[in-house]
Regions:
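A membrane-cytosol interface segment of integral membrane proteins
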Residues: 161-190
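Membrane-embedded catalytic scaffold of the fatty acid hydroxylase/desaturase
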Residues: 3-162
């Protein structure tokens, strides 16, 4: 099954290309989850978090997890991606999600260089801003160049990292930390 097998692509090349395509697919899924209202209702659980730390990387609605798995499975099957490439991709994706959601500061000169290739915590923190223009930016998890390529990159938050508001303006307060409240969020109006 899959394009790599149909065209007899060497396993190493297939693995590298699969990794890059899967990363683009996850970036695209993230963009679409912000742009399509039904998917945003589900994804906003992730953005309702008023903090920005490792737990934010794990804060996804079960419906979003299922949809993401189906999307990635479709890509994997269509490509005929090598199993080892998929395993490596998932390990890197989860590790990078924890890294770029970490409430950590990398020295600015180092961050400037790193973010040309990978998503850094400061780069992704902009995406969790309560400012809509900033929320709709910096969608990447692994590679940062997708945002530059498709003009969704924002360098710094308008208010600066120390003064920016994290989360969504419509969902502030202690309720956002309640598991049952967040699980019901896709079914709430607005």
């Amino acid at each position: 099954w899959g394009l790599f097998n149909i065209f007899g692509v060497a396993p190493v090349i297939a693995g590298i290309v699969a990794f890059i395509i899967l990363d683009f697919a996850v970036w695209l899924e993230h963009v679409v989850s912000h742009k399509w209202p039904l998917l945003w209702r589900i994804h906003r659980m992730h953005h309702a978090d008023q903090g920005f730390d490792l737990t934010t990387a794990l804060r996804f609605h079960p419906l979003e997890i299922v949809l993401s798995m189906l999307w990635k499975a479709t890509i994997i099957i269509a490509l005929g991606a090598p199993a080892i490439a998929v395993l490596i991709f998932e390990i890197v994706l989860n590790g990078m999600a924890m890294f770029n959601h970490a409430n950590a500061r990398i020295p600015r000169p180092v961050d400037r260089v790193l973010r040309w290739l990978v998503v850094t915590p400061d780069m992704h923190r902009v995406h969790h801003s309560a400012v809509h223009r900033e929320t709709d930016s910096n969608y990447g998890f692994n590679f940062s160049f997708w945002d530059r390529l498709f003009a969704t990159y924002v360098d710094q938050p308008q208010a600066g990292h120390d003064k920016m508001t994290i989360g969504l303006n419509d969902y502030q307060g202690p309720k956002t930390a309640n598991l049952f409240w967040t699980l019901a969020l896709p079914f709430r109006p607005k």
